[in-house]
Amino acid sequence: MPDITLTTLQSLKLKGEKITMLTCYDATFAHASCQAGIEVLLVGDSLGMVLQGNDSTLPVTTDELAYHTASVKRGNDGAFIIADLPFMGYATLEQTFQNAGKLMQAGAHMIKVEGAVWLAESIRLLAERGVPVCAHMGLTPQSVNLLGGYKVQGRNEAQARQMRADAIALEQAGAAMILLECVPSELAAEITQAVKVPVIGIGAGSATDGQVLVLHDMLGLSITGRVPKFVKNFMTGQASIHDALSAYVAEVKGVTFPGAEHGFSA
């Protein structure tokens, strides 16, 4: 696969071609994902749940994410790598710079932070120093205790209006990508149209510029057996993991996934 860059992803948005993203934590799955045509690999703090067995992402550390980012880099064959800054890993500007530097040195092409308009200063300072940033909005798992659980965000008009304004403000601050998790499909479509940067969705309908799922979820692997509404098991009916990954790419590119049943209404 030719090297995917931020310019490539921006071009896909302009052309109206959907972007494919999956979480990835090791070299073997990085290689397999690239072979199937996955364009973006997200080294997510979700590893705390699907690899470590924790009940949230909060225990994950920057050093653990750097370790897995380096592993993904070694198996990567052209995909764009995004790495999460973990819970409290960007509480101060000094922490933000130090931890973002670790992840970029480990092999990330972009770092992802969770939050809203309060992230603007950190995003601006990182962007000015050559670190591309993805702003993760909507349901932000690192804030699960504040949010009162894993709930759809932006369902009332005040929340929706604020989220639209925050997305525009974060783009203006320098965010090069936005990820929307568990927001009403109509709101996600509005935000996607309102900003020029690529918008990736998970539980955000089909109108975003691309889709992401947790690798283990889309392969039907779960410790708890609880499957989010927005997940589809792509192993069903497939002979191999490669076929499942390829089916995901085909359905995202063909805009057959996600279906209406995978999204949320206001």
From Swiss-Prot:
Cofactor(s) in the UniProt record: Mg(2+)
Gene Ontology molecular function terms on file: 3-methyl-2-oxobutanoate hydroxymethyltransferase activity; magnesium ion binding
UniProt keyword list: Cytoplasm, Magnesium, Metal-binding, Pantothenate biosynthesis, Transferase
Main location per the UniProt record: cytoplasm
CDD domains hit by this protein: KPHMT-like
Binding site for 3-methyl-2-oxobutanoate: 45-46, 84, 112
Pathway membership: Cofactor biosynthesis; (R)-pantothenate biosynthesis; (R)-pantoate from 3-methyl-2-oxobutanoate: step 1/2
Location of this chain's protein in the cell: Cytoplasm
InterPro entries the record matches: Pantoate_hydroxy_MeTrfase, Pyrv/PenolPyrv_kinase-like_dom, Pyrv_kinase-like_dom_sf
Catalytic activity, reaction form: 3-methyl-2-oxobutanoate + (6R)-5,10-methylene-5,6,7,8-tetrahydrofolate + H2O = 2-dehydropantoate + (6S)-5,6,7,8-tetrahydrofolate
Keyword Cytoplasm: yes
GO BP, sorted A to Z: pantothenate biosynthetic process
The EC number(s) this enzyme carries: 2.1.2.11
Cofactor note: Binds 1 Mg(2+) ion per subunit.
Protein origin, superkingdom: Bacteria
Record: residues binding Mg(2+): 45, 84, 114
Class in the EC hierarchy, top level: transferase
Annotated Pfam families: Pantoate_transf
Quaternary organization: Homodecamer; pentamer of dimers.
Role played: Catalyzes the reversible reaction in which hydroxymethyl group from 5,10-methylenetetrahydrofolate is transferred onto alpha-ketoisovalerate to form ketopantoate.
Family designation: Belongs to the PanB family.
Protein name listed in UniProt: 3-methyl-2-oxobutanoate hydroxymethyltransferase
Organism: Pseudomonas fluorescens (strain SBW25)
Gene that encodes the chain: panB
